[in-house]
């Protein structure tokens, strides 16, 4: 009997938390922080914190507040690869999407068509910001700096010894054909990027979510 009561209480608590999260999303304003999904952050699974970058009627654009993991843009050498074909996009829309979000949360995520310079348009549920989006939402370098979770650092994510800030990928390719752009620890964008196979740069996922559900 006690086990049944405990189970009921847990279900009620989970439902309450879910309602609170849904309400926070529905009331989200640009610049605010919300929680959505869960991911390993160094001490087990923890709610993912997101910064609201944009709000358009019934949907909002979220960017993870912290860099959550460290991954290469593309795992094998291929100078012709763009965001459309890279392994990082496959991981974000596959393993990450399926493990970080519940069925209810996935139902809120809006699949969008992303345009990326010098790359085919893509249909994404989870993605990285493009250089154009970075410039639109973060006009000054100081606002672009980010911390990485303990887990991301443990996976090899690079951080500055001076500031502790991380280097994080964008989905836009750099001038060399075998390189992709990333945001440096100081918020500047290295126009030459780095090798797409580099596994020291971190990942800040972005999602559009329905805020009227």
Regions found by a protein language model. Give the residues of each.
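Sec-dependent N-terminal signal peptides of Gram-positive bacterial secreted proteins and lipoproteins
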Residues: 4-22
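Collagenous Gly-X-Y triple-helix signature in extracellular proteins
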Residues: 23-213
């Amino acid at each position: 009997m006690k086990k049944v009561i405990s189970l009921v209480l847990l279900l009620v608590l989970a439902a309450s938390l879910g309602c609170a999260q849904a309400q926070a999303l529905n009331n989200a304003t640009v610049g605010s922080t919300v929680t959505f999904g869960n991911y390993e952050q160094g001490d087990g699974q923890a709610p993912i914190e997101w910064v609201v970058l944009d709000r358009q009627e019934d949907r909002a654009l979220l960017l993870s507040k912290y860099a959550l993991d460290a991954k290469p843009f593309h795992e094998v050498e291929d100078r012709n690869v763009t965001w459309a074909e890279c392994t990082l996009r496959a991981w974000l829309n596959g393993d990450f999407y399926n493990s970080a979000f519940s069925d209810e949360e996935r139902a809120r995520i809006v699949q969008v068509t992303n345009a990326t310079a010098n790359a085919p348009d893509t249909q994404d549920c989870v993605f990285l910001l493009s250089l154009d989006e970075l410039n639109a939402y973060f006009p000054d370098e100081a606002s672009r700096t980010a911390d990485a979770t303990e887990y991301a650092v443990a996976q090899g994510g690079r951080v500055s010894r001076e500031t502790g800030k991380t280097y994080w990928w964008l989905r836009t390719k750099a001038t060399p054909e075998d390189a992709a752009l990333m945001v440096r620890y100081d918020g500047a964008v290295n126009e030459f990027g780095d090798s797409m196979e580099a596994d020291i740069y971190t990942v800040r996922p972005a999602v559009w979510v329905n805020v009227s559900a």
